[in-house]
Amino acid sequence: MNPMGRKWANIVAKKTAKDGANSKIYAKFGVEIYVAAKQGEPDPESNSALKFVLERAKQAQVPKHVIDKAIDKAKGNTDETFVEGRYEGFGPNGSMIIVDTLTSNVNRTAANVRTAFGKNGGNMGASGSVSYMFDKKGVIVFAGEDADAIFEQLLEADVDVEDVEAEDGSITVYTEPTDLHKALEALRANGQEEFQVTELEMIPQTEVTLEGEDLETFKGLIDALEADDDVQKVYHNVADM
């Protein structure tokens, strides 16, 4: 059993509520939409990267005006450049963190991430110090009960699917990252229209459990990292968070 299956099934509603209430998430999606639209056509039908970002923005309840503004900006003559980055580090008691960024100022972002680690009980590590303990996977979550039927649908569509789990009325599909879009198309072809999560995730090979002061310190560290405007994603190996 994938150790993250229970995690996705349990936190998806909480995640959606949190994202929907957080205007910072909107701004971060605005940047991501702009970058995707700028790198290709500003039309999701001819730009799969943009289509994927817009699908995720919908799940996070990003307002239409935020999306339209980002796409309009990409259509203009602006030459603002954003660079993807990844930082890795450690929290208390065996906890590991990966931070993905999208920034127009790499030096600023690197300094901010290092400060967030240092001031909140963590340590930033070298590139590769943590990521080898995580696997990149496609993750899809939607309402449903019959994991076996979904698994069969995906196999018939020649999707490289790793696992399908059903729990608490939700189905979680894990795919190889290159097959995430293929899996989505197969599910849509079989009548599945609404998705709670469609993400490329870094999934820990093992999880740790934190308690008491360690857990509070770790939560503060994650909050500090996620509060940075340039931080797009934070992955970690702490259970039940």
Swiss-Prot record:
Keywords (A to Z) from UniProt: Cytoplasm, DNA-binding, Transcription, Transcription regulation
Subcellular location: Cytoplasm
InterPro entries reported in the protein's UniProt record: Integrase-like_N, TACO1_YebC-like_2nd/3rd_dom, TACO1_YebC_N, Transcrip_reg_TACO1-like, Transcrip_reg_TACO1-like_dom3, Transcrip_reg_TACO1_YeeN, YebC-like
Gene Ontology CC: cytosol
Keyword hit for Transcription regulation: yes
This protein's record includes keyword tRNA processing: no
SUPFAM superfamilies the UniProt entry points to: YebC-like
GO molecular function, a single term: DNA binding
GO terms under biological process: regulation of DNA-templated transcription
Cross-referenced Pfam families: TACO1_YebC_N, Transcrip_reg
Classification via HAMAP family: Transcrip_reg_TACO1 (MF_00693), Transcrip_reg_TACO1_YeeN (MF_00918)
Family label: Belongs to the TACO1 family. YeeN subfamily.
Protein name: Probable transcriptional regulatory protein str0195
UniProt organism field: Streptococcus thermophilus (strain CNRZ 1066)
Lineage: Bacteria, Bacillati, Bacillota, Bacilli, Lactobacillales
